Amino acid sequence: MTTIVCVRKNGKVAIGGDGQATLGNCVEKGTVRKVRRLYKDKVVTGFAGSTADAFILRDLFEKKLELHQGHLVKAAVELAKEWRTERSLRRLEAMMIVANESEFLLVSGSGDVIEPEFDVLAIGSGGNFAKSAALALLRTNNELSAAEIVKQALIIAGDIDIYTNHNHVIEEV
């Protein structure tokens, strides 16, 4: 379990996640890097769910990005199609948020590719806490940047969700 949150504000997109990995009810590691840059550092992805499954999906997404020359939506849709139809991938338990400088999407194992209605997406066990905090800050605080809103949302999620820690990685595109 984890928290990944993505915010768009003033032409910037920031995505961040915590670093906690659990096995059952035990914390196995607190410094997992769940947010990574891809495709010439122009795309950032964050994952929630099974770590091994997420790495497989991230690698597949990176291949789709290369194939489609960095076109985020096309790569995400093609990944979702393959995820749903390829028998070996159907059992993978993970979700991803993918972002570039102008758009960001949620990609799920059920084949969903969702563009946010508002300028916030969040996934993982602390996702609803982070989304609520980010939406509130986005609507009421004009001084915070996208990255600062992501940081505050992750702090709040980590204070509430036992599967989210305070070791954050935040990237901005």
Curated annotation (Swiss-Prot):
One annotated GO molecular function: threonine-type endopeptidase activity
Gene Ontology cellular-component annotations: HslUV protease complex; proteasome core complex
CDD domains: protease_HslV (cd01913)
Reactions it catalyzes: ATP-dependent cleavage of peptide bonds with broad specificity
Matching SUPFAM superfamilies: N-terminal nucleophile aminohydrolases (Ntn hydrolases)
UniProt cross-references to Gene3D superfamilies, sorted A to Z: Glutamine Phosphoribosylpyrophosphate, subunit 1, domain 1 (3.60.20.10)
Location in or out of the cell: Cytoplasm
Notes on activation and inhibition: Allosterically activated by HslU binding.
Keywords from the named record: Allosteric enzyme, Cytoplasm, Hydrolase, Metal-binding, Protease, Sodium, Threonine protease
Sequence intervals crossing the membrane: none
Catalytic residues, chain numbering: T2
Binding site for Na(+): G158, D161, T164
InterPro entries: ATP-dep_Prtase_HsIV_su, Ntn_hydrolases_N, Proteasome_sua/b, Proteasome_suB-type
Principal localisation: cytoplasm
GO biological-process terms attached to the record: proteolysis involved in protein catabolic process
EC number: 3.4.25.2
Matching PROSITE patterns: PROTEASOME_BETA_2
Protein family (similarity comment): Belongs to the peptidase T1B family. HslV subfamily.
Function: Protease subunit of a proteasome-like degradation complex believed to be a general protein degrading machinery.
Subunit: A double ring-shaped homohexamer of HslV is capped on each side by a ring-shaped HslU homohexamer. The assembly of the HslU/HslV complex is dependent on binding of ATP.
Designated name of the protein: ATP-dependent protease subunit HslV
Lineage: Bacteria, Pseudomonadati, Pseudomonadota, Gammaproteobacteria, Pasteurellales
